[in-house]
Amino acid sequence: MPWNSEHTNWFFKIETNLKSKDGKEVCLLEYNYDLNDKTVLSKWAKHFRNHYCFDSEIDFLRNGTGLSRKDFLVQLKFPTEARGFGSGIRSGDFSEILVADYLEYILGYWVPRTRYGNKTIRDESTKGTDLIGFKLYDENKTTKDVLKMFEVKAQYSGNKAKPRLQDAIDDSIKDDLRKAESLNAIKQRLFDKGKTEEALKVARFQNQVDMPYTSEFGVAALYSNDIYDEDVIINCDTSAHPYNSALFLIVIKGDDMMKLVHKLFEIAADES
């Protein structure tokens, strides 16, 4: 399998009393990556690349294009580095994948990886809920099952921090309405990939009346350290969220995050 979790060892939780304006606790994490650790970066790049195109499929998909594996990824699959909205899409995709890895490998949810491989336009973000994670407890479809919908926002450049956590909170308000479409999209993509067993796991969550489970919500904001501003975080407000009591807030910050984003795309292409 292409998936790898060693890069999640670079997460460090910062003990803090950080709270939103309405008293909601905020989990603060530092992401202390190491660009000199070639082994971890290589494994991570493979993990990252396979979100866009499985290594087992790349030769078939590039057939007829006249492109090498690297050029196929750079010219047709990966968001562009500098053109138009490409850089912003790169940072958004990276941030969603990083939070998905935290959700799966640190918090113990199953997060299907279906969001990026079927993009029609590579410099656009995929519509729908950013992330959905699942906890399935047994074959009897017990009410212990959990579905967690996550919205992710990032800012890695600029002179002043924007209210990205508030933006994620506001987007999360719509997630319950988008749930049915998002679940159907995940299930269909898994089925199209021949992953019928995983598609059936998603089906367990498509009718909450007949198969009860717990719904949870999460929001994440990611910043580079040079623009991170605690005042922007503590001024966010979750009181308008209809599922406020089931809302998890997380902030991830690290040094020069956009440098890491571009480096990861570079390694993913070079080692394809």
Can you say where each PLM-predicted feature lies in the sequence?
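Charged, structured surface patches that assemble and position nucleic-acid processing machinery
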Residues: 201-272
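Short, solvent-exposed loop/turn segments that connect beta-strands within catalytic domains
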Residues: 137-145
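Conserved catalytic cores of phosphodiester-cleaving nucleases, focusing on short active-site segments
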Residues: 103, 131-133, 148-154
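Nuclease-adjacent, charged terminal/linker segments that flank catalytic cores
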Residues: 1-70, 77, 265-272
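Charged, often glycine-rich, active-site loop that binds/positions anionic groups
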Residues: 73-76, 82, 123-133
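Acidic, metal/cofactor-coordinating or nucleic-acid-engaging core segments within structured domains
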Residues: 158-228
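A short acidic/basic microdomain associated with nuclease active sites
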Residues: 106-124
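A short, highly charged nucleic-acid-interacting micro-segment common to nuclease
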Residues: 78-100, 120-122
